[in-house]
Amino acid sequence: MKMNREILRIAVPNIISNITVPIMGIVGTMIAGHLNGNSSATIGALAIGVSIFNFIYWNCSFIRMGTSGITAQAYGAGDVKTTTLMLARAVAVSLVVGLAMIVFQYPIGSAALKVMNGNDMVADYFFARIWAVPAGVLLFGLNGWLTGMQNAVIPMIVAVAVNVIHIAFSFWFAFDFGMGITGIAYASVVAQWTGVVITALIVRIHYRKRFVAITMSEVTDMRAMKEFFVINRDIIVRTLCIVATYTFFTAASARMGNDVILAVNTILLQLFTLFSYMNDGFAYAAEALTGRFIGARDPRSLRDCIRKCMIWCVIVAVLYVGIYIGWWRDLLELFIDSEVTDAHEIIDYAGRFIGWIIAIPLAAAMPFVMDGIMVGATQSRIMRDSMLLSTAAYFAIFFTMRPLIGNNALWMAFSLYMFLRGVLQYFLSARLGKIYSQAE
């Protein structure tokens, strides 16, 4: 029971934090679906714009994961100096990456719009939201450090605040100011920068007595920075694979032939996102606790933690399967204004693929917790190799099956991709033997 409390202490705040993210996406999709009489075109434009920023943010997620794993192990070992240095390094790297995105926004935007077949609506969205990127990357670094410090409450408070602000400003800008989906982008800028300010203030107040004096030369120590980037090199490769699969999913949907398929796949993917962000709460718990118990050299607690995190992820998966079986049509109707001309066509067409959404939670239960374990153990090579193999399978299945089953091939490829991620990490880690040995 004590371990379950430890898991829930970290998982529940992260679930609350994470569940606000798909809610924000759902609200954005709902706003797009109510902006004019052509829901499919507007939802599709927003989906492409969001996919571009998912590509950018996911490519920066190595900052969060690398910071979290190293910090958690230092926390478990009682190494206050390293935890302080990791915060400084996370902020420094985040600032450099975020500012680079601003400097190179035009070539990045032009390339992204060309690859994704983005129209003028997507372009307006991109060049508005790009100013939120430095803040978003900073939040990655800060939240990674807080996760490593076993603190899920501060990220929860900030996430709720950011998403409430984003939703409120989205309605205000999109409808009252008539800015359309560009208003949703500007709402993100306001919300993300507010989140950075809130996080910085809370961290300063809460941890001011737990920091030790450090120098700039220690922060920029080449040996330590090299270690940080070597760990994150593999995470970057893994992240690129994730970005490629999700971005390709939207791009392939857009190239299927009509706006209805793109709208349907966008909405169904939002339902999967509802599941993924909740299960990710237990992945964060596995991440923080795995690092902590490895740092503390406590193999017994490590085994108990991993086993119970896996059980919790399966429970969540079964819960979502039940929800999707019973209320899938009601959930879909939240996204579309029933007054628009193509609403019933979108919902009826989505029904053809709902079986995949019901099955995916079971296929995806294991990879989430395995990701958390590998991040906490800083086993980045295992994460990289499993992701490369899973991604190769994803594309092979899609291109092989598409001529035979059309859009079903995309969902089949995605389902098997998720399943393989978990299975491969389990076996590449010698059935977790490599993880347990780190705590001995």
Tell me the role of every PLM-derived stretch:
Residues 1-14, 71-134, 174-233, 290-359, ...:
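Short alpha-helical transmembrane segments in multi-pass integral membrane proteins
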Residues 26-30, 141-145, 164-172, 200, ...:
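Alpha-helical transmembrane segments of multipass membrane proteins
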Residues 43-103, 139-155, 264-323, 364-378, ...:
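Small-residue-rich hydrophobic transmembrane alpha-helices
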Residues 15-65, 69, 132-136, 226-292, ...:
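Transmembrane helix-bundle signature of multi-pass secondary active exporters and lipid flippases
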Residues 61, 129-148, 155-163, 184-199, ...:
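Short runs within selected transmembrane alpha-helices of multi-pass transporters and secretion channels
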Residues 23-26, 34, 40, 74-77, ...:
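Helix-loop interface residues and adjacent transmembrane-helix termini in multi-pass membrane transporters
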Residues 68, 109, 161, 230, ...:
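ATP/adenylate-binding site constellation spanning eukaryotic-like Ser/Thr protein kinases
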